[in-house]
Amino acid sequence: MNLPNKLTVLRCIMTPLFLLALLWAFPYHYVAALVLFSAASLTDLFDGKIARARGLVTNLGKFLDPLADKTLTTAAFLGFMVKLPGAGLCWAVMLILTREFMVTSVRLLAAKDGVVIAASMAGKAKTVLQMVSILYMLAALQAGELIGEGALTSGLLIAGQVLIWIAVAATVISGIQYVWACRRYFTDRADDVR
């Protein structure tokens, strides 16, 4: 296994550690979650750069990298649902999960035909927006823990929710683009069923 793929696997390993830090209340657990999420996000930045610079792009990497991204960001959004149950994030998470399952299904259908669908620019932008909104929300949660409840904490959390909904919009748009670009995998399969 080459270095970029090892970084991707490392991101997968860091995901449950991040989720544990997010959900398990211990002193500065949001800081620990923020550090773990930041480190995992950096592996996403570096695995692709190293793979392209050194000519180490593989089909495994093209398939595993977006899957590792989905796992990391989904864990964060599910964690936020648990930590902020009244924040209306359930719908955001449902839209994100629907898009992720849909795109993963398209990738699996394509893989059956020997085609590996790499992440598109819209998909990469979606991932960046999701990661930024998650990082902001982790910082806002930690700030809220330090300064206590009040107008400032509420404002920080509302701004975080707005960022999450911006990421949701990008998620839905990129999902529609993926399905449209890969619609032949649906029509071909539908013809096979008839």
Task: Give the residues covered by each predicted segment.
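Hydrophobic alpha-helical transmembrane segments of integral membrane proteins
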Residues: 1, 9-13, 62-65
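C-terminal membrane-associated helical module and adjoining short loops/tails
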Residues: 1-5, 14-15, 25, 34-41, ...
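Multi-pass alpha-helical membrane architecture of UbiA-family
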Residues: 4-7, 79
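Core segments of transmembrane alpha-helices
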Residues: 10-17, 68-77, 103-104, 126-138
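Active-site His/Glu-centered metal-binding helix of metallohydrolases
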Residues: 13, 42-50, 67, 71, ...
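Membrane-embedded alpha-helical segments that form the functional core of polytopic membrane enzymes
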Residues: 14-60, 76-96, 155-172
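C-terminal ends of transmembrane helices
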Residues: 48-53, 105-113, 176-182
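Helix-adjacent hinge/juxtasegments
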Residues: 60-116
